[in-house]
Amino acid sequence: MNPELQSAIGQGAALKHAETVDKSAPQIENVTVKKVDRSSFLEEVAKPHELKHAETVDKSGPAIPEDVHVKKVDRGAFLSEIEKAAKQ
């Protein structure tokens, strides 16, 4: 390695001072956060409630028309056919 380069690396670089802007403080002045008593709320949630029946439309099934038939593929025969073609 070049001796000039080694000495430049050894001396290091002169860095300029960086000014930082701390924005971690709250943006709204004169605001206090109050402690909320959640015990009454939690008691209300724990009580049994009467719920209304909800009508749902289940569209999670496959959207294949009834006149379309999907047949099962014999995977073993299919793979052996590919294997035979690869050996040729």
UniProtKB/Swiss-Prot annotation:
CDD domains attached to this UniProt entry: WH2_Actobindin
Record bears the keyword Acetylation: yes
Entry annotated with the keyword Protein transport: no
Post-translational modification N-acetylmethionine, affected residues: M1
Post-translational modification N6,N6,N6-trimethyllysine, affected residues: K35, K72
Keyword entries, A-Z: Acetylation, Actin-binding, Methylation
Disulfide bonds: none
Region entry Disordered, spans: 1-22
Pfam family for this entry, one: WH2
Domain of life: Eukaryota
Domain WH2: 37-54
Gene Ontology molecular function: actin monomer binding
Assembly mode: Monomer.
Record function comment: Is able to bind two actin monomers at high concentrations of G-actin.
Name under which the protein is recorded: Actobindin
Organism of provenance: Acanthamoeba castellanii
